[in-house]
Structures are given as C-alpha cells and as structure tokens.
Curated annotation (Swiss-Prot):
Gene Ontology CC terms, in alphabetical order: extracellular region
Name of the protein in its database record: Conotoxin AbVIO
Entries under Pfam families matching the protein: Conotoxin
GO molecular function, one term: ion channel inhibitor activity
Residue ranges listed under propeptide: 18-40
Major localisation: secreted
Organism: Conus abbreviatus
Record's subcellular location: Secreted
C-alpha cells in the first residue's frame, strides 16, 4: 500500500512539473515581464511620497513621506 502511494505521489509531481514547463514555453513573454518587474523595483528617496517603510531607501516613512 505504501509503495502504491509513493508511486501515485511521484506521478502527480511529474505531471505538475510537465504542465508548468509547458505553460512557460507557451507564454515566455509573461515570464520575462515578471522577471523584468522584479529587476526594475527601486526604493524611494528622501522626501518622496510613500505608503510604507519598506518602500523607502531609509526604511522610514512618516506621514507618507520618506526620510
């Protein structure tokens, strides 16, 4: 019974991996755009409008202004 369960889980994993790889080949532009958006993120400089501390280079957002 354990052997059957392991074989079943392995087969499910292989099927999921194959469908993910197929999806990436069909839509390479989506993969590139998500990769580019991660690379183009930057922090906000001093006196720029902010929403949270993590968006500021100084990690200090007070009254929606980076310090």
């Amino acid at each position: 019974v354990i052997i059957i369960a392991v074989l079943f889980l392995t087969a499910c994993q292989l099927i999921a991996t194959a469908s993910y790889a197929r999806s990436e080949r069909k839509h390479p532009d989506l993969r590139l755009s998500s990769r580019n958006s991660k690379l183009s993120k930057r922090c906000l400089g001093s006196r720029e409008l902010c929403v949270r501390d993590t968006s500021c280079c100084s990690m200090s957002c007070t009254n929606n202004i980076c310090f």
